[in-house]
Amino acid sequence: KCRLVIDFDFKYKEKLVNRQYDEDVIQKFITHIFSKISELYILSDEKKVCFVMEKGSFVDAPQKGYESKDGLHFLFPHIIAEKDTYKVLRKALLDLDIEKICKDAGFTPPSNDIEGIIDEAIYKGGNWFVYGGGKPTEQDKYKLTRIYKETNSGLMPLPIKLWIDNPLEIMKLNSVSNHSELSVDYTDKLQNGLKKKTLKQSISTESIDSMELNPHVLNKAMKYDIDI
C-alpha cells in the first residue's frame, strides 16, 4: 500500500520552442483523473487534493526518434491504497484524450501514445525519485508548482508556500514507500476489477499523516483547507 502518484511522460518528435501545455490543460488532466478516482475509490472531500510537480522547462529527449520531452507528476497525498488498484486506475485513465485537449488549447500534442504517456513502472516496483531528486543526467528537477482541491464547483487552487517552505514534508508526501493501512475504501467497480478480492479496512487521512508529517505543517495546511 502506498500513496497515489501518477506520472505523465510527454515525448515530442519536434524540437520544442515553448512548453506545450498550460494551467488550463493541467486542470483538464486533473479533472479527468478525479472523475476516474471517484469511480474506483470512496473518499471524503478533504482527501480530494492533488499536488502538481513540474520541471522548469522541457528538455532534449535522449530517446531515439524524439527531439524533446516533458512531463507532469501528480501526487494525491491523502489517497493510500494497494498498488494493484492503481493499475486498474491507470487502465481507466487510458481513455484520456490528451491529443484533443492539447490541440483544443493550441498546443502540439505529445508524439508518444497514451500507453507511453501514463507511466506504469512505478506500480510495478519501478523507480520513483524523491522530491527534488532526478536522473543524474538532468539538472532540472521536479518541484511542487501547484496544489488543487476538488470541490463541487470545480478545482480550487490552494497556496503552495507552506509546503515550499517545508520541502522535507513534501519529500515525505512524495514517498511511495509502503504503508500499513489504507486511507480510502474501494467501490464495487474497483473490487470487480481486481483479481484479489481481499480488502483492508481504511483509516482516516488524519491519523496516517499525523504519524508521518510535521504536525505544525499538517495542521496549518488542513486548517486552510477547512477555512476555504
Label each PLM-derived region with a short phrase.
Residues 1-72, 76-109, 128, 134, ...:
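Signature for HUH/AEP ssDNA processing cores
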